[in-house]
Amino acid sequence: MVRAKNWTLKKHFHGHPTDSDFELKTVELPPLNNGEVLLEALFLSVDPYMRLGSKRLKEGDTMMGQQVARVVESKNPAWPVGTLVLAHSGWASHSISDGQQLEKLLTEWPDTLPLSLALGTVGMPGITAYFGLLEICGAKSGDTVLVNAAAGAVGAVVGQIAKIKGCRVVGAAGSEEKVDYLKKIGFDFAFNYKTVKSLEETLKKAAPDGYDCYFDNVGGEFSNTVIRQMKKFGRVAICGAISMYNSTGQLPPGPSPESVLYQEIRMEGFIFNRWKGEVGQKALKELLTWVLEGKIQYREFVIEGFENMPAAFMRMLKGENVGKARSESLKSGTCKPGDHPHDLIFPIT
């Protein structure tokens, strides 16, 4: 019998999640049936969507999420022992799968690259950035692109893809450390939205002629201000609204209908799983190539230990992460934190 540890939703969040909202449970997994595999988590992801998605869970359910896992026992010939996979097993140290929802890592994945990037730059956040910018926004050479939460897992990739495509890129972030990071990875203009005297004036200074594309991860009043500075026929990709996820009061009104109407702005929300299958795999391969060529740089916000999953989640929602936030489940994993110069380690104290 394998004893699995699961982080469960003890009670639904009210405002900012707290430790008391989670419960760590240990369960004994049954023997495998034919066609099933036993997975051992190596790296687990925490993402903003989990804050909203948790509303669909029942209290007592395992928290949702993606992980890089290793097959440690198999009764499915398609998934032999030792296979490394992407699994939607949630916050679980071990899980059983019938193989239907598993994905293999790209065959081109080099030994020199951390496997955890399959949860970040060369994974769901990368796909979100890739298609949100290139398909939803339709960014092209010469465009001025604005992205907020720009030092996060999605935003940092958005900005770097935009630079690859010949755009001028403006990024907003919530600390001076993050602003410095954005400048380091090639943003043309970056600012700390928490310290500027006037968001409106800062946006005008960054792009006096306005913005062609706006990749929105934040929502709220920030976005209302941006909409008023969009160019004619501007495009807005609505990826998230993290500024409002923990709100318990009345939400701010949306953007001015007058601005949207007379500037003929196109706004579209989207979710990454629209691009599954071959089209998604092609994008992942291109992202991997850009990483290996040094055209896309990355950082990871790493918290060690499965027991610290709630802490990783809460710190990500508070904006403490630079780059992709994830947890290292097992110290016996194939890539230890610190093995790669782009890792940022934030131990729990």
Curated annotation (Swiss-Prot):
Its main location: cytoplasm. Gene3D superfamilies: Medium-chain alcohol dehydrogenases, catalytic domain, NAD(P)-binding Rossmann-like Domain. It is an enzyme of class 1 (oxidoreductase). The modification N6-acetyllysine is found at K178. It comes from the Eukaryota. GO terms for molecular function: 13-lipoxin reductase activity; 15-oxoprostaglandin 13-oxidase [NAD(P)+] activity; 2-alkenal reductase (NADPH) activity; leukotriene B4 12-hydroxy dehydrogenase activity. Pfam families: ADH_N_2, ADH_zinc_N. The modification Phosphothreonine is found at T18. It comes from Oryctolagus cuniculus. The modification N6-(2-hydroxyisobutyryl)lysine is found at K178. This is Prostaglandin reductase 1. SUPFAM superfamilies: GroES-like, NAD(P)-binding Rossmann-fold domains. Belongs to the NADP-dependent oxidoreductase L4BD family.
